[in-house]
Amino acid sequence: MPAAQTRDKTSVTPEQMKKLVEQLKPEYDYIIIDCPAGIEHGFKNAIAAAQRAIVVTTPEVSAIRDADRIIGILDANEMPRIDLVINKIRMDMVRRGDMMSVDDVSDILSVNLIGTIMDDENIVISSNRGEPIAGTKTKSGKEYEYIAKRIAGEALDLDNDVKSLNLFKWFKKKDKDVHKIQSQGL
């Protein structure tokens, strides 16, 4: 279910949300409730009916602070399971020290990491076209696939995400550029 798009998030109560989810359970294996940003009424509605929370954050200080606050609220509300997805990771910035690494974010938030998604223009293109990125042969498509499999209970090592990123390509590009520069006598 998508997050409410109206300003009035109070039109549905937490009890109504619980009833709605109970009505949907016989029809679906998974019911995903998209939560609005922030911790207002819409957030409280979503967690009232949830059996599991997946916190999605980016490796930016303000986003991590918000995620930490959300995790604290989920803990206080006795959420049975809290997982983490780190989105919009830019390895070039991580290498320069301008962005926190996956390990840094995961260590700070101390919840189960189920996936990472690199910052990828294919996601924007796919979204603008109204086409799903999951299931495509792009890196981000694979990352979404791995996350979905983990949500479904498949025990995939997070190394699969790293392998899908093909981090070694960074070194190859660099080597090619060095070779190109050397061959041009620069």
What are these regions (language model features)?
Residues 1-26, 125-129, 134:
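P-loop/Walker-type NTP enzyme "switch/lid" segment
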Residues 15, 19, 23-26, 30-125:
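Conserved catalytic-core segment of NTP-binding enzymes
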Residues 76, 80-186:
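C-terminal lobe/tail of nucleotide-utilizing enzymes
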